[in-house]
């Protein structure tokens, strides 16, 4: 998958990086081409969290990026999805937990309802999972908190939302 950009963590002091996490993430579309977003609200080691984020999660050993995305969307959100395109890779860092992230983004569509099996930390952190028209999703990101982990998510995903908008525009023109 093509590396789109790399981002540095300017919110937490750098000490060292001791692990890399591969993460599959998706811009999940419903029949109206609305985008599925998770609303994150919590206070934890990262500080105050109040932002939106695409669903996804870590890739397990012997699991492809595509398999990881499909599994994570069902577990976190309760949807069965079909991947329709790749967007690209975005690498970033979470200095606070000494981690380098390789985020692999896909576009997928909902094809059914599955079994949601959230982890306890996801139940605590994810306050809402809902679909949003693309322009509304962009506005939500533009108005997100501009500090701490919310800023890191915003700088990682807002450019991708604009790419998804362009993708949907081109798709509608066909």
State where each predicted segment sits.
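Conserved Nudix-box catalytic region and its N-terminal flanking loop in Nudix hydrolases
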Residues: 34-75
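Nudix hydrolase/Nudix homology domain
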Residues: 121-174
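Structural detector for helix-capping/boundary residues
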Residues: 57, 71, 84, 132-135
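Acidic, metal-coordinating catalytic segment for phosphate/diphosphate chemistry
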Residues: 1-25, 31
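Active-site-adjacent beta-strand/loop module that shapes the phosphate/pyrophosphate-binding cleft
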Residues: 92-116, 130
């Amino acid at each position: 998958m093509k590396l789109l950009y790399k981002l540095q963590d300017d919110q937490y002091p750098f000490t060292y990086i001791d692990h890399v996490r591969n993460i599959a993430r998706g811009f999940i579309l419903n029949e109206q081409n609305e985008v599925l977003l998770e609303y994150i609200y919590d206070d934890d080691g990262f500080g105050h969290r109040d932002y939106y984020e695409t669903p996804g999660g870590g890739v397990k050993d012997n699991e492809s990026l595509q398999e990881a995305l499909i599994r994570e969307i069902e577990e976190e959100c309760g949807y069965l999805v079909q991947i329709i395109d790749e967007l690209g890779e975005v690498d970033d860092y979470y200095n606070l937990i000494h981690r380098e992230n390789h985020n692999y983004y896909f576009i997928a569509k909902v094809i059914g309802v599955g079994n949601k099996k959230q982890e306890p930390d996801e139940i605590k952190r994810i306050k809402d999972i809902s679909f949003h028209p693309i322009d509304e999703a962009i506005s939500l990101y533009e108005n997100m908190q501009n500090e701490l982990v919310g800023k890191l998510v915003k700088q990682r995903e807002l450019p991708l939302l604009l790419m998804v908008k362009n993708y949907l525009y081109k798709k509608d023109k066909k």
